[in-house]
């Protein structure tokens, strides 16, 4: 059989990404200005679109959860899940949140309460209440709904219908063979690859900044661009090795270890920190989150600093989740084979969101407690060092900081590790075992992307590029949802026979119901 594992999508995507890296290296200031102008335009004209889209995605997930399709198995009928529940949760959580969770659990609530606030005056009790509810909002079920719907589409078409693991293949019910084989399908897959590279490179950029600042804070290691490049190179070698060894050996092991370490820090801070204050903050924040769920979901201030806050936080986060959706979605689908749609949605939508709430309550409340009681000025700490600045004021602070630094490093590896696998799959005609050469190539490109982002403007440049990359791919997500609902509506009752037939391409096998056979 002819070897076709490396597709044209790989080479086209690689060329586009290389051109971007070269442009950023030669014209960094021009790139920074260009991305800032585009981001400003998108924020002014498309904020409403991002807010409505993410809310609609959440509604679709809930609808499917309670629909007659909820008991469909994402795989062959009667197939058992490949991974245990604890390993499954650990892998989807590590891939879905990664470095960002550690980066923002302290910095975001502090910023909402004492810096640029969403509604009330900074430093007031109302602003502190807002801080936790908006942190829950940004990292809660909205984010996981975006991941979940894309993952569900992939899992349904790949494991239930037997299509190849490509974004274009999921659009077959809408566009026919063109979506899977023609230029339009190739363009869609290239767009998915670029969105993934951008989203993951942004996380690598955040990770390099925080690891560098953590080393500087704890050990006075120099904090500069050179050190950040060194960190990216070292971690690139690590996650490339992990991706080379495969999901079961690499990602699964690292994810399990990292979740254990993350919970060690979480429980440790909960015990040595202001425990009662944390519990009260969590309860109050959860209540406010539920009470103001829809107002937060659809809130657009008229202008000024409040609109700037919306752009810097909510729109940025919604864009981040969308740009991460192809990567996280495909990875979650890959590790969710054998689960029912109901089990899948419940697991992906609610369990990780609750864990995020707990992390934000423990870390965020511990920081707010220090600030509000004038014990330490955490608000003046850099975003990258806010967590370390908080931990040092509690017993065992240095030990917890060391473990936190290790957690960030492993999150760094697991996020990029998962992404190299997904990028390899997208650029290898959906091959679930992409060539090591392809995975290594994407690891290098993501590292270069992250370096260019830091070089051209640090955190702000990263945020700008995420918002830009998410807009075109959001249209693809809408089409994927439409395609899923169309295909689900054609599902026969679960007692219909399934027959294995061959697709036009003899290398691709597809499961279809007897209804589809009649139609053909």
Q: Where are the predicted features?
A:
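Hydrophobic alpha-helical segments of multi-pass membrane transport proteins
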Residues: 16, 49-66, 262-273, 355-365, ...
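Long, low-complexity, intrinsically disordered cytosolic termini of multi-pass membrane proteins
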Residues: 498-520
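Helix-loop-helix module between adjacent transmembrane segments
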Residues: 2-11, 15-25, 58-63, 97-101, ...
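Membrane-embedded translocation segments of transport machinery
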Residues: 180-182, 192-339, 346, 351-402, ...
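N-terminal alpha-helical transmembrane segments of multi-pass membrane transport
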Residues: 1-127, 267, 481-488, 514-519
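Membrane-water interface regions at transmembrane-helix termini and the short interhelical loops
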Residues: 1-4, 28-42, 61-80, 132-137, ...
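Flexible loop linkers connecting adjacent transmembrane helices
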Residues: 33-39, 66-85, 110-133, 156-183, ...
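Membrane-interface alpha-helices at helix entry/exit sites of multi-pass transporters
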Residues: 48, 85, 123-131, 179-190, ...
């Amino acid at each position: 059989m002819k070897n076709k594992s490396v597709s044209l999508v790989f080479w086209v995507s690689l060329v586009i990404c290389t051109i971007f890296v070269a442009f950023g290296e030669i014209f960094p200031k021009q790139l920074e200005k260009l991305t800032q102008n585009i981001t400003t335009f998108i924020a002014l004209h498309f904020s409403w679109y991002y807010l409505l889209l993410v809310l609609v995605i959440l509604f679709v997930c809930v609808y499917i959860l309670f629909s007659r399709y909820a008991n469909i198995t994402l795989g062959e009928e009667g197939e058992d899940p490949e991974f245990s529940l604890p390993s499954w949760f650990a892998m989807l959580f590590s891939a879905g949140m990664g470095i960002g969770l550690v980066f923002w659990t302290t910095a975001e609530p502090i910023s909402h309460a004492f810096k640029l606030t969403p509604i009330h005056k900074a430093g007031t009790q109302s602003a502190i209440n807002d801080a936790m509810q908006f942190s829950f909002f940004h990292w809660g079920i909205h984010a996981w709904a975006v991941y979940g719907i894309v993952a569900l589409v992939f899992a349904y078409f790949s494991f239930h219908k037997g299509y190849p693991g490509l974004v274009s293949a999921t659009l077959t019910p809408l566009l026919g063979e063109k979506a899977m084989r023609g230029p339009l399908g190739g363009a869609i897959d290239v767009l998915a690859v670029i969105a993934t590279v951008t989203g993951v490179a942004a996380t690598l950029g955040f990770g390099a900044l925080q690891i560098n600042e953590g080393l500087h804070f704890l050990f006075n290691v120099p904090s500069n661009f050179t050190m950040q490049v060194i960190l990216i190179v070292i971690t690139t070698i690590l996650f490339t090795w992990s991706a080379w060894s495969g999901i079961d050996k690499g990602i699964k092991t690292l994810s399990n270890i990292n979740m254990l370490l993350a919970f060690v820090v979480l429980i440790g801070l909960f015990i040595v920190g202001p425990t009662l204050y944390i519990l009260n903050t969590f309860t109050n924040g959860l209540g406010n989150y539920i009470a103001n769920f829809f107002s937060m979901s659809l809130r657009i201030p008229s202008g000024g600093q409040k609109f700037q806050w919306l752009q810097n936080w909510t729109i940025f986060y919604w864009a981040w989740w969308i740009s991460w959706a192809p990567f996280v979605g495909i990875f979650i689908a890959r590790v969710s084979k054998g689960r029912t749609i109901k089990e899948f949605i419940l697991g992906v939508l609610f369990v990780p969101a609750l864990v995020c709430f707990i992390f934000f309550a423990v870390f965020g409340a511990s920081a707010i407690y220090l600030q509000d009681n004038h014990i330490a000025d955490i608000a003046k700490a850099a975003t990258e060092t806010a967590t370390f600045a908080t931990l040092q004021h509690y017993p065992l602070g240095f030990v917890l900081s060391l473990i936190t630094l290790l957690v960030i490093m492993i999150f760094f590896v697991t996020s990029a590790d998962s992404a190299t696998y997904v990028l390899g799959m997208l650029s290898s005609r959906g091959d679930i075992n992409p060539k090591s050469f392809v995975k290594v190539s994407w690891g290098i490109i993501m590292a270069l992307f992250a370096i260019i982002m830091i070089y051209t403007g640090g955190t702000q440049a990263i945020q700008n590029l995420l918002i830009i990359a998410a807009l075109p791919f959001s249209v693809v997500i809408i089409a994927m949802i439409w395609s899923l609902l169309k295909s689900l509506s054609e599902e026969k009752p679960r007692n219909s026979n399934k027959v294995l037939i061959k697709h036009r391409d003899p290398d691709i096998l597809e499961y279809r119901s007897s209804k589809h056979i009649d139609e053909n």
